[in-house]
Amino acid sequence: MSLLTEVETYVLSIIPSGPLKAEIAQRLEDVFAGKNTDLEVLMEWLKTRPILSPLTKGVLGFVFTLTVPSERGLQRRRFVQNALNGNGDPNNMDKAVKLYRKLKREITFYGAKEVALSYSTGALASCMGLIYNRMGTVTTEVAFGLVCATCEQIADSQHRSHRQMVTTTNPLIRHENRMVLASTTAKAMEQMAGSSEQAAEAMEVASQARQMVQAMRTVGTHPSSSAGLKDDLLENLQAYQKRMGVQLQRFK
């Protein structure tokens, strides 16, 4: 796996699924391929994206700034600086300075990532802030190691919270989660259908699922009544994908 592929993997792991994630993935690919060369336009686009947390925007802004060549005097963006200030906690800043000194001695991506992983997310963000604000310099490879360590910490906490939701015994939360997943799967089916011969069938199945979810939410149902809904829909989607010869992994 190349360095940029690894960076893209880690960065995308902290972005919520949806159309915006696909859009960001495309921007990252363009940036890493040297196609998107106007940093000002890119940062303005990032600043106005909905849904993303300030820290996620800060990480993306840092990656774009590292990768896209820019004029020397180009102004640093306030939304990135605010996201990478470690919540203004002096403790985070002290740790960030210590981490920065260690990173200065590193020369490889993996070395930097390993060193950084022993610090908290706040300290890692503050350290990125130091580098972003030109208060310190490290090689691009080391900076990317810092980025990936930060993403790993964020993804770990997101995974813990997701696991808590999936394993919750609260039937109302489980019921709503199944309906949300059914709606998301229906949307995926509609997007995949495109103009193929089986498109009408896929759209019909997706439409029925949406109507079912809408009815269940409107009328109110017993929390166990949605148990088979998502599974049925996924089975339909996978059968449709097999006929179309599409990879299944993406929707598992």
Swiss-Prot record:
Membrane topology qualifier: Peripheral membrane protein
Superkingdom assignment: Viruses
Signal sequence range: none
GO biological process: viral budding from plasma membrane
Alphabetized GO MF terms: RNA binding; structural constituent of virion
SUPFAM superfamilies: Influenza virus matrix protein M1
Keywords: Host nucleus, Membrane, RNA-binding, Viral matrix protein, Virion
Motif stretch (Nuclear localization signal): 101-105
Subcellular location per the Swiss-Prot or TrEMBL entry: Virion membrane; Host nucleus
GO CC, alphabetical: host cell nucleus; membrane; virion membrane
Region (Membrane-binding): 1-164
Pfam family, one: Flu_M1
Positions of the UniProt region annotated as RNP-binding: 165-252
Family from the record: Belongs to the influenza viruses Matrix protein M1 family.
HAMAP family found in the cross-reference section: INFV_M1
Other information: Most abundant protein in virion. When expressed alone can form virus-like particles in transfected cells.
Function: Plays critical roles in virus replication, from virus entry and uncoating to assembly and budding of the virus particle. M1 binding to ribonucleocapsids (RNPs) in nucleus seems to inhibit viral transcription. Interaction of viral NEP with M1-RNP is thought to promote nuclear export of the complex, which is targeted to the virion assembly site at the apical plasma membrane in polarized epithelial cells. Interactions with NA and HA may bring M1, a non-raft-associated protein, into lipid rafts. Forms a continuous shell on the inner side of the lipid bilayer in virion, where it binds the RNP. Determines the virion's shape: spherical or filamentous. Clinical isolates of influenza are characterized by the presence of significant proportion of filamentous virions, whereas after multiple passage on eggs or cell culture, virions have only spherical morphology. Filamentous virions are thought to be important to infect neighboring cells, and spherical virions more suited to spread through aerosol between hosts organisms.
Subunit structure: Homodimer and homomultimer. Interacts with NEP. Binds ribonucleocapsid by both interacting with genomic RNA and NP protein. May interact with HA and NA. Cannot bind NP without genomic RNA.
Name of the protein: Matrix protein 1
Organism in which the protein naturally occurs: Influenza A virus (strain A/Chicken/Weybridge H7N7)
Gene encoding the protein: M
